[in-house]
Protein backbone atom coordinates (compact mmCIF):
# COMPACT_ATOMS: atom_id res chain seq x y z
CA UNK A 1 0.00 0.00 0.00
CA UNK A 2 1.36 3.41 -0.97
CA UNK A 3 1.24 6.66 0.98
CA UNK A 4 -2.19 7.84 2.07
CA UNK A 5 -1.32 11.49 2.71
CA UNK A 6 0.48 14.49 1.28
CA UNK A 7 1.51 17.77 2.89
CA UNK A 8 1.53 20.84 0.67
CA UNK A 9 1.82 24.57 1.00
CA UNK A 10 -1.39 26.44 0.33
CA UNK A 11 0.15 27.76 -2.90
CA UNK A 12 0.95 24.21 -4.05
CA UNK A 13 -2.55 23.06 -3.14
CA UNK A 14 -4.08 25.90 -5.15
CA UNK A 15 -1.82 25.09 -8.10
CA UNK A 16 -2.90 21.44 -8.13
CA UNK A 17 -6.59 22.30 -7.99
CA UNK A 18 -6.07 24.72 -10.89
CA UNK A 19 -4.12 22.22 -13.01
CA UNK A 20 -6.67 19.47 -12.32
CA UNK A 21 -9.64 21.71 -13.02
CA UNK A 22 -11.05 20.60 -9.68
CA UNK A 23 -12.56 23.97 -8.87
CA UNK A 24 -12.23 26.05 -5.72
CA UNK A 25 -11.48 24.82 -2.23
CA UNK A 26 -14.21 24.96 0.42
CA UNK A 27 -14.33 28.27 2.25
CA UNK A 28 -13.43 26.67 5.58
CA UNK A 29 -9.88 25.95 4.33
CA UNK A 30 -9.40 29.56 3.18
CA UNK A 31 -7.16 28.52 0.27
CA UNK A 32 -7.59 31.43 -2.11
CA UNK A 33 -5.86 32.54 -5.34
CA UNK A 34 -2.25 33.47 -4.48
CA UNK A 35 -2.05 36.19 -7.11
CA UNK A 36 -4.13 39.31 -7.58
CA UNK A 37 -3.50 39.78 -11.30
CA UNK A 38 -4.39 36.98 -13.73
CA UNK A 39 -1.30 37.85 -15.77
CA UNK A 40 0.77 36.37 -12.91
CA UNK A 41 -0.86 32.96 -13.25
CA UNK A 42 1.57 31.42 -15.77
CA UNK A 43 4.69 32.31 -13.79
CA UNK A 44 3.05 31.10 -10.58
CA UNK A 45 2.06 27.74 -12.07
CA UNK A 46 5.52 27.23 -13.57
CA UNK A 47 7.26 27.86 -10.24
CA UNK A 48 4.87 25.65 -8.27
CA UNK A 49 4.96 22.85 -10.84
CA UNK A 50 8.76 22.78 -10.67
CA UNK A 51 8.64 22.40 -6.89
CA UNK A 52 5.91 19.74 -7.07
CA UNK A 53 8.00 17.82 -9.59
CA UNK A 54 10.96 17.83 -7.19
CA UNK A 55 8.62 16.49 -4.51
CA UNK A 56 7.39 13.68 -6.77
CA UNK A 57 3.79 14.90 -6.74
CA UNK A 58 4.01 15.79 -10.44
CA UNK A 59 6.00 13.63 -12.89
CA UNK A 60 8.36 14.80 -15.61
CA UNK A 61 5.50 14.81 -18.13
CA UNK A 62 3.50 17.20 -15.94
CA UNK A 63 0.95 14.63 -14.76
CA UNK A 64 -0.22 14.79 -11.15
CA UNK A 65 0.12 11.65 -9.01
CA UNK A 66 -3.31 9.93 -9.40
CA UNK A 67 -3.72 9.48 -5.65
CA UNK A 68 -3.04 13.14 -4.92
CA UNK A 69 -5.33 14.14 -7.79
CA UNK A 70 -8.14 12.08 -6.29
CA UNK A 71 -7.65 13.55 -2.81
CA UNK A 72 -7.66 17.12 -4.12
CA UNK A 73 -10.74 16.47 -6.25
CA UNK A 74 -12.59 14.85 -3.35
CA UNK A 75 -12.03 17.92 -1.19
CA UNK A 76 -12.93 20.44 -3.90
CA UNK A 77 -15.95 18.50 -5.13
CA UNK A 78 -17.18 16.82 -1.96
CA UNK A 79 -20.79 15.67 -1.98
CA UNK A 80 -20.93 15.49 1.83
CA UNK A 81 -18.67 17.16 4.37
CA UNK A 82 -17.97 18.31 7.89
CA UNK A 83 -16.38 21.76 8.29
CA UNK A 84 -14.02 21.99 11.28
CA UNK A 85 -12.61 25.07 13.03
CA UNK A 86 -10.19 24.34 15.88
CA UNK A 87 -9.36 27.25 18.19
CA UNK A 88 -6.70 27.02 20.90
CA UNK A 89 -5.87 30.67 21.55
CA UNK A 90 -6.10 34.19 20.15
CA UNK A 91 -5.31 33.97 16.46
CA UNK A 92 -4.44 30.26 16.70
CA UNK A 93 -6.79 28.57 14.24
CA UNK A 94 -6.59 25.12 12.67
CA UNK A 95 -8.98 24.66 9.76
CA UNK A 96 -10.23 21.29 8.64
CA UNK A 97 -12.69 19.34 6.57
CA UNK A 98 -13.90 15.76 6.36
CA UNK A 99 -14.84 15.37 2.68
CA UNK A 100 -16.82 12.49 1.17
CA UNK A 101 -17.27 11.76 -2.52
CA UNK A 102 -18.51 8.38 -3.78
CA UNK A 103 -16.56 5.82 -1.75
CA UNK A 104 -13.69 8.18 -0.94
CA UNK A 105 -13.17 10.02 2.36
CA UNK A 106 -10.40 12.60 2.67
CA UNK A 107 -9.49 14.69 5.70
CA UNK A 108 -7.91 18.07 4.94
CA UNK A 109 -6.26 20.02 7.77
CA UNK A 110 -4.73 23.45 7.34
CA UNK A 111 -2.30 24.95 9.86
CA UNK A 112 -0.87 28.35 8.87
CA UNK A 113 0.45 27.97 5.30
CA UNK A 114 0.55 24.15 5.26
CA UNK A 115 -2.31 21.84 4.39
CA UNK A 116 -2.38 18.04 4.72
CA UNK A 117 -4.65 15.78 2.69
CA UNK A 118 -5.17 12.29 4.16
CA UNK A 119 -7.24 9.48 2.63
CA UNK A 120 -9.02 7.61 5.41
CA UNK A 121 -11.23 4.56 5.80
CA UNK A 122 -14.13 5.89 7.86
CA UNK A 123 -17.00 3.43 7.86
CA UNK A 124 -18.63 4.19 11.21
CA UNK A 125 -19.51 7.19 13.34
CA UNK A 126 -16.94 6.28 16.00
CA UNK A 127 -14.15 6.40 13.40
CA UNK A 128 -14.88 10.11 12.99
CA UNK A 129 -14.21 10.95 16.65
CA UNK A 130 -10.36 10.90 16.52
CA UNK A 131 -10.48 13.15 13.45
CA UNK A 132 -12.89 15.61 15.04
CA UNK A 133 -10.78 15.89 18.20
CA UNK A 134 -7.33 15.86 16.55
CA UNK A 135 -6.67 19.53 17.22
CA UNK A 136 -7.78 19.49 20.86
CA UNK A 137 -5.90 18.93 24.12
CA UNK A 138 -6.74 15.25 24.64
CA UNK A 139 -8.84 15.74 27.78
CA UNK A 140 -10.95 12.99 29.31
CA UNK A 141 -14.73 13.47 29.47
CA UNK A 142 -15.64 15.97 32.17
CA UNK A 143 -17.85 14.91 35.06
CA UNK A 144 -20.88 17.13 35.60
CA UNK A 145 -24.66 17.09 35.45
CA UNK A 146 -26.02 17.61 31.95
CA UNK A 147 -27.85 20.87 31.36
CA UNK A 148 -29.44 22.76 28.49
CA UNK A 149 -29.85 26.41 27.56
CA UNK A 150 -31.60 28.23 24.74
CA UNK A 151 -28.83 29.11 22.30
CA UNK A 152 -29.94 32.75 22.29
CA UNK A 153 -29.59 32.93 26.07
CA UNK A 154 -26.06 31.59 25.84
CA UNK A 155 -25.18 34.22 23.25
CA UNK A 156 -26.60 36.99 25.44
CA UNK A 157 -24.67 35.68 28.44
CA UNK A 158 -21.44 35.68 26.44
CA UNK A 159 -22.05 39.31 25.44
CA UNK A 160 -22.80 40.31 29.05
CA UNK A 161 -19.60 38.69 30.31
CA UNK A 162 -17.55 40.41 27.60
CA UNK A 163 -19.12 43.69 28.71
CA UNK A 164 -17.95 43.16 32.29
CA UNK A 165 -20.81 41.36 34.02
CA UNK A 166 -19.57 39.11 36.88
CA UNK A 167 -19.20 35.58 35.51
CA UNK A 168 -20.49 33.86 38.66
CA UNK A 169 -23.66 35.97 38.65
CA UNK A 170 -24.38 35.25 34.99
CA UNK A 171 -23.94 31.49 35.45
CA UNK A 172 -26.19 31.49 38.50
CA UNK A 173 -28.85 33.44 36.61
CA UNK A 174 -28.70 30.93 33.75
CA UNK A 175 -29.17 28.07 36.20
CA UNK A 176 -25.93 26.28 35.33
CA UNK A 177 -25.61 23.34 37.79
CA UNK A 178 -22.94 23.81 40.48
CA UNK A 179 -21.10 20.71 39.23
CA UNK A 180 -20.69 22.34 35.81
CA UNK A 181 -19.79 25.88 36.82
CA UNK A 182 -15.99 25.39 37.06
CA UNK A 183 -16.02 23.99 33.52
CA UNK A 184 -18.18 26.77 32.13
CA UNK A 185 -16.04 29.38 33.89
CA UNK A 186 -12.92 27.96 32.22
CA UNK A 187 -14.68 28.20 28.85
CA UNK A 188 -15.48 31.88 29.32
CA UNK A 189 -12.10 32.87 30.78
CA UNK A 190 -10.21 31.38 27.82
CA UNK A 191 -8.68 28.28 29.42
CA UNK A 192 -9.92 25.98 26.69
CA UNK A 193 -9.46 24.64 23.20
CA UNK A 194 -12.46 23.81 21.07
CA UNK A 195 -13.68 22.70 17.68
CA UNK A 196 -16.82 23.87 15.90
CA UNK A 197 -18.38 21.32 13.52
CA UNK A 198 -20.92 22.09 10.80
CA UNK A 199 -22.24 19.52 8.31
CA UNK A 200 -23.12 20.08 4.67
CA UNK A 201 -23.86 18.42 1.35
CA UNK A 202 -24.54 19.13 -2.31
CA UNK A 203 -28.20 18.57 -3.10
CA UNK A 204 -29.87 19.19 -6.46
CA UNK A 205 -27.11 21.55 -7.52
CA UNK A 206 -27.14 23.54 -4.29
CA UNK A 207 -25.02 23.60 -1.14
CA UNK A 208 -27.00 22.74 1.97
CA UNK A 209 -25.54 23.19 5.46
CA UNK A 210 -26.87 22.66 8.95
CA UNK A 211 -28.32 25.74 10.66
CA UNK A 212 -26.27 25.08 13.76
CA UNK A 213 -23.29 22.93 14.68
CA UNK A 214 -21.72 20.75 17.34
CA UNK A 215 -18.89 21.96 19.59
CA UNK A 216 -16.33 19.92 21.52
CA UNK A 217 -14.50 21.87 24.22
CA UNK A 218 -11.42 20.80 26.18
CA UNK A 219 -11.02 22.56 29.54
CA UNK A 220 -8.66 21.95 32.48
CA UNK A 221 -11.58 20.08 34.08
CA UNK A 222 -12.26 17.78 31.13
CA UNK A 223 -14.00 17.58 27.77
CA UNK A 224 -17.47 19.03 27.14
CA UNK A 225 -19.81 18.33 24.24
CA UNK A 226 -22.33 20.98 23.18
CA UNK A 227 -24.95 19.76 20.73
CA UNK A 228 -28.14 21.35 19.38
CA UNK A 229 -31.77 20.30 19.39
CA UNK A 230 -34.75 22.26 18.11
CA UNK A 231 -37.61 22.95 20.52
CA UNK A 232 -41.27 22.72 19.49
CA UNK A 233 -41.39 26.50 19.04
CA UNK A 234 -38.43 26.37 16.64
CA UNK A 235 -35.90 27.73 19.12
CA UNK A 236 -32.48 26.07 19.18
CA UNK A 237 -31.46 24.53 22.49
CA UNK A 238 -27.81 23.84 23.35
CA UNK A 239 -27.29 20.77 25.53
CA UNK A 240 -24.05 20.45 27.51
CA UNK A 241 -22.89 16.91 28.29
CA UNK A 242 -19.62 15.14 29.16
CA UNK A 243 -17.60 14.72 25.96
CA UNK A 244 -17.30 10.95 25.74
CA UNK A 245 -16.52 9.30 22.40
CA UNK A 246 -20.00 7.74 22.32
CA UNK A 247 -21.68 11.08 22.96
CA UNK A 248 -19.62 12.79 20.25
CA UNK A 249 -20.41 10.04 17.72
CA UNK A 250 -24.13 10.29 18.47
CA UNK A 251 -24.14 14.08 18.24
CA UNK A 252 -22.42 14.07 14.84
CA UNK A 253 -24.77 11.31 13.67
CA UNK A 254 -27.76 13.50 14.54
CA UNK A 255 -26.11 16.48 12.85
CA UNK A 256 -25.56 14.70 9.53
CA UNK A 257 -28.96 12.99 9.75
CA UNK A 258 -30.62 16.43 9.80
CA UNK A 259 -29.54 17.03 6.18
CA UNK A 260 -31.71 15.91 3.23
CA UNK A 261 -29.59 12.81 2.47
CA UNK A 262 -29.77 11.67 6.07
CA UNK A 263 -27.21 9.67 8.02
CA UNK A 264 -23.74 9.09 6.64
CA UNK A 265 -23.82 5.55 7.99
CA UNK A 266 -27.41 4.26 7.69
CA UNK A 267 -26.24 0.64 7.88
CA UNK A 268 -24.15 1.23 11.00
CA UNK A 269 -26.60 2.08 13.80
CA UNK A 270 -25.06 3.34 16.99
CA UNK A 271 -25.35 1.18 20.09
CA UNK A 272 -25.13 2.36 23.65
CA UNK A 273 -23.81 0.86 26.86
CA UNK A 274 -27.03 1.02 28.86
CA UNK A 275 -25.34 -0.10 32.08
CA UNK A 276 -22.99 2.87 31.80
CA UNK A 277 -25.84 5.17 30.83
CA UNK A 278 -27.84 4.12 33.87
CA UNK A 279 -24.90 4.94 36.11
CA UNK A 280 -23.92 8.28 34.59
CA UNK A 281 -26.82 9.78 32.66
CA UNK A 282 -28.89 12.61 34.09
CA UNK A 283 -31.73 14.27 32.25
CA UNK A 284 -30.56 17.74 31.23
CA UNK A 285 -32.20 20.59 33.06
CA UNK A 286 -33.60 23.07 30.57
CA UNK A 287 -33.33 26.62 31.82
CA UNK A 288 -35.64 29.07 30.02
CA UNK A 289 -35.52 32.15 32.20
CA UNK A 290 -36.62 35.57 31.04
CA UNK A 291 -33.86 38.15 30.82
CA UNK A 292 -34.52 41.09 33.11
CA UNK A 293 -34.46 44.52 31.55
UniProtKB/Swiss-Prot annotation:
Disruption phenotype: Deletion of the gene impairs iron-bound mycobactin utilization and EsxG and EsxH export. Keywords: Chaperone, Cytoplasm. The keyword Transferase does not apply. Pfam families: ESX-1_EspG (PF14011). Its main location: cytoplasm. One of its GO terms (cellular component) is cytoplasm. The keyword Cytoplasm applies. It is found in: Cytoplasm. It comes from the Bacteria. Belongs to the EspG family. This is ESX-3 secretion-associated protein EspG3. It comes from Mycolicibacterium smegmatis (strain ATCC 700084 / mc(2)155). The gene is espG3.
Amino acid sequence: MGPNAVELTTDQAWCLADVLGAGSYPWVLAITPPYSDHSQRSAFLAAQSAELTRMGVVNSAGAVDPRVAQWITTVCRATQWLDLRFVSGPGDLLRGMVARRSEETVVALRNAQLVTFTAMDIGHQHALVPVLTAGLSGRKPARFDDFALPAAAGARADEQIRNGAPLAEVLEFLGVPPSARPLVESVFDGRRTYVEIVAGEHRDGHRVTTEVGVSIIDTPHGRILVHPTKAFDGEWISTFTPGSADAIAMAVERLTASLPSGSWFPDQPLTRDFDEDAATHREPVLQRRTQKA
